[in-house]
Curated annotation (Swiss-Prot):
<dbReference type="InterPro" id="IPR050198">
    <property type="entry name" value="Non-receptor_tyrosine_kinases"/>
</dbReference>
<dbReference type="GO" id="GO:0004715">
    <property type="term" value="F:non-membrane spanning protein tyrosine kinase activity"/>
</dbReference>
<feature type="compositionally biased region" description="Polar residues">
    <location>
        <begin position="34"/>
        <end position="49"/>
    </location>
</feature>
<keyword id="KW-0391">Immunity</keyword>
<keyword id="KW-0597">Phosphoprotein</keyword>
<dbReference type="GO" id="GO:0005794">
    <property type="term" value="C:Golgi apparatus"/>
</dbReference>
<dbReference type="GO" id="GO:0030133">
    <property type="term" value="C:transport vesicle"/>
</dbReference>
<dbReference type="InterPro" id="IPR000980">
    <property type="entry name" value="SH2"/>
</dbReference>
<keyword id="KW-0968">Cytoplasmic vesicle</keyword>
<feature type="region of interest" description="Disordered">
    <location>
        <begin position="34"/>
        <end position="53"/>
    </location>
</feature>
<feature type="binding site">
    <location>
        <position position="268"/>
    </location>
    <ligand>
        <name>ATP</name>
    </ligand>
</feature>
<feature type="active site" description="Proton acceptor">
    <location>
        <position position="359"/>
    </location>
</feature>
<dbReference type="GO" id="GO:0005901">
    <property type="term" value="C:caveola"/>
</dbReference>
<dbReference type="GO" id="GO:0006887">
    <property type="term" value="P:exocytosis"/>
</dbReference>
<keyword id="KW-0965">Cell junction</keyword>
<dbReference type="Pfam" id="PF00017">
    <property type="entry name" value="SH2"/>
</dbReference>
<dbReference type="Pfam" id="PF00018">
    <property type="entry name" value="SH3_1"/>
</dbReference>
Length: 504
């Protein structure tokens, strides 16, 4: 980081960022991430104590992947290396290698506590049933590929998910509840009980014993993204190299860029004057706290005009462009409904956090290389200072996606986002066709006042169209919640059957 010098947080005294600026007046200022919290580990003042790793309170972690240090404050390690945690600080922890005794920062999502389930390749922590299905059905897996995950419904319990094949449905995933014995053991069927999950896995690898398939190999998992650089929230423009223009919107451009020569990112450049720096920074600090795997991750900001918004890079671009592409236009209906379910999941999180998107449409959904849909630009609409966008007569106002009460009275709520989601469903099922084809904005407003709603496209199932029509109820309070919409879309093809298999 050039002119940064390493300082570590000290319990009880003044706190220093890892990347505090030096006295050099030309050194660009890095401002810490507003969401990071610091927890000194039990060994933080124990630096030279012999036998670290033997105390009862020590947090010993093992590396799940290799990591090559980018900065001199970081600690390189190989898969399988063990380290003692000195300080838990957001996504980067300070640790000491038990082998080399070297200290430095490590990405916390690259390690797991020794002897924890997370060290097992078949254990997927905190993954939902639906995401388990998405991952097991992804390329690279086979019949009998499996994972054990935390139960969504019963805290402290687990579920087994297995890839299967059904002549009618094709590739599918079956789920089994793993039940717990009073003595701490585990079973799927009461006739076969095990003292550990490892024993359970070994047993069902030898034979299916009533499961749909014999367990073959753990579900393929990719190395997680490294956490964003520690304490790099407000960053200098010079740290970014804009490389390829990905698109241009009403308020700026989107670029593929490299941060500090090592991290691929997307950069949204805002036209000067499109928003006040103070309002933007206040909103960005709030947006930074909204972290969910179906929301585009906000990494950093440049707060001098022109404002830059730095986010994770999404390889397939906007959902709108993807749906119109050769690859997107070949996606079958179940995949389109899966896209819709992913977006509903992200919006259910926004709803739960009492936040509002205000500009939900296919152009503001981004698609990853593995076809994960993530919501982008949440909250930005609120701070735009452009009458062309904020006034309903303005050329940039997204009339066709906007709920009547937001058009007429300017009142945006999560229920107006639900209306927009109904329009977004129509965009998805028509592969990116503009809503209300052939109608101008004033014609749309007049038609809505008469009670007009877009008709059902030929390829759209009645049940999906019913969701759209519920999203377009005139009275906002009669529209469904995103939580409800997510539950319907998640189980769109399986609502009539039990999600979990009966005991074998």
């Amino acid at each position: 980081m050039g002119c940064m010098k390493s300082k570590f947080l000290q319990a009880g005294g003044n706190t220093f960022s890892k990347t505090e600026t030096s006295a050099n007046p030309h050194c660009p200022v890095y401002v810490p991430d507003p969401t990071s919290t610091i927890k000194p580990g039990p060994n933080s003042n124990n630096r030279n104590t012999p036998g670290i790793g033997e105390g009862s309170e020590d947090i010993i972690v093992v590396a799940l992947y290799d990591y090559e240090a980018i900065h001199h404050e970081d600690l390189s390690f190989q898969k399988g290396d063990q380290m003692v945690v000195l300080e838990e600080s957001g996504e980067w922890w300070k640790a000491r290698s038990l082998a080399t005794r070297k200290e430095g920062y490590i990405p916390s999502n690259y390690v797991a506590r020794v002897d924890s389930l997370e060290t097992e390749e078949w254990f997927f922590k905190g993954i939902s049933r639906k995401d388990a299905e998405r991952q097991l059905l992804a390329p690279g897996n086979m019949l009998g590929s499996f994972m054990i995950r935390d139960s969504e419904t019963t805290k402290g319990s687990y579920s087994l998910s297995v890839r299967d094949y059904d002549p009618r449905q094709g590739d599918t995933v079956k789920h089994y509840k793993i039940r717990t014995l009073d003595n701490g053991g585990f079973y799927i069927s009461p006739r076969s009980t095990f003292s550990t999950l490892q024993e359970l896995v070994d047993h069902y690898k030898k034979g299916s014993d009533g499961l749909c398939q014999k367990l073959s190999v753990p579900c393929v998992s990719s190395k997680p993204q490294k956490p964003w650089e520690k304490d790099a929230w407000e960053i200098p423009r010079e740290s970014l190299k804009l490389e390829k223009k990905l698109g241009a919107g009403q308020f700026g451009e989107v670029w593929m860029a490299t941060y500090n020569k090592h991290t691929k990112v997307a950069v949204k450049t805002m036209k000067p004057g499109s928003m006040s720096v103070e309002a933007f920074l206040a909103e960005a600090n709030l947006m930074k706290t909204l972290q969910h795997d179906k929301l585009v991750k906000l990494h950093a900001v440049v707060t001098k005009e022109p404002i830059y918004i730095i986010t994770e890079f999404m390889a397939k671009g906007s959902l709108l462009d993807f749906l119109k592409s050769d690859e997107g236009s070949k996606q079958p209906l179940p995949k389109l409904i899966d896209f819709s379910a992913q977006i509903a999941e992200g919006m259910a999180f926004i709803e739960q956090r009492n936040y509002i998107h205000r500009d939900l449409r296919a152009a503001n959904i981004l698609v990853s290389a593995s076809l994960v849909c993530k919501i982008a630009d949440f909250g930005l609409a609120r701070i735009i200072e452009d009458n062309e966008y904020t006034a309903r007569e303005g050329a940039k106002f997204p009339i066709k996606w906007t709920a009547p009460e937001a058009i007429n009275f300017g009142s945006s709520t999560i229920k107006s986002d639900v209306w927009s989601f109904g329009i977004l469903l129509m965009e998805i099922v028509t592969y990116g066709r503009i809503p209300y084809p052939g109608m101008s904005n004033p014609e749309v407003i007049r038609a809505l006042e008469r009670g007009y709603r877009m008709p059902r496209p030929e390829n759209c199932p009645e049940e999906l169209y019913n969701i759209m029509m519920r999203c377009w109820k005139n009275r906002p309070e009669e529209r469904p919640t995103f939580e409800y919409i997510q539950s319907v879309l998640d189980d769109f093809y399986t609502a009539t059957e039990s999600q979990y298999q009966q005991q074998p």
